[in-house]
Curated annotation (Swiss-Prot):
TM ranges: none
Function: Component of the chloroplast ribosome (chloro-ribosome), a dedicated translation machinery responsible for the synthesis of chloroplast genome-encoded proteins, including proteins of the transcription and translation machinery and components of the photosynthetic apparatus.
Alphabetical list of PANTHER family matching this protein: 39S RIBOSOMAL PROTEIN L18, MITOCHONDRIAL, LARGE RIBOSOMAL SUBUNIT PROTEIN UL18M
UniProt GO MF annotations: 5S rRNA binding; structural constituent of ribosome
Family: Belongs to the universal ribosomal protein uL18 family.
Misc note: There are two forms of L18, alpha and beta, both with a MW of 11.5 kDa. They probably differ by an unknown post-translational modification; their first 26 amino acids are identical.
Protein name (database record): Large ribosomal subunit protein uL18c
Length: 166
């Protein structure tokens, strides 16, 4: 046997008189020069919270569409303000809007660290009143990729309490 095609293994048996013996094992020729392939290294992509939110919003927008009979109520949160729009996607028009930048809210509520749940409730109340004045009773809620929790939930609940149907 050639040295390249044989492997040596150390084999000890309790029954044998010598403490160790070497056995030869031959391999088929296809395994002689075998090297495992190096697989490509797959790294996880680092996404920011904003990128994840926009991806969720894109998925939501594929399912939620505003029509003239049932426009889309869209929520946007920033660190300092909260914005809500009622949008007719067929005409690409904003039918009603409310935000913390409007004087009716910014004068009545004093907040320094951004909008709170109470502020979100006031905005939900304002957008519901604005929609009802314009004859809009049914809307499709678009949470904008944000979790339905906290300010987004408070806004939606306040809008429902004041007459909007989701």
């Amino acid at each position: 046997m050639a040295a390249a095609t044989s492997l040596s293994f150390f084999h000890s048996t309790l029954a044998s008189s010598s403490s160790s013996s070497v056995q030869q094992l031959s391999l088929p020729p296809k395994f002689v020069n075998f090297r495992p392939q190096t697989l490509p290294l797959i790294q996880a992509k680092a996404h920011t919270r904003r990128e994840d939110r926009t991806a969720r919003h894109v998925r939501i927008r594929k399912k939620v569409e505003g029509t003239p009979e049932r426009p889309r109520l869209c929520v946007f949160r920033s660190n300092k303000h909260l914005y809500v729009q009622v949008i007719d996607d067929t005409k690409m028009h904003t039918l009603a809007a409310a935000s913390t930048m409007q004087k009716a809210i910014s004068e009545n509520i004093d907040y320094s660290a951004g909008p709170t749940v109470e502020v979100a409730q006031k905005i939900g109340e304002m957008i519901a009143k604005s929609c009802l004045e314009k004859g809009i009773t049914k809307v499709a809620f678009d949470r904008g990729g944000y979790p339905y929790h906290g300010r987004v939930k408070a806004l939606a609940d306040a809008a429902r309490e004041h007459g909007l149907v989701f």
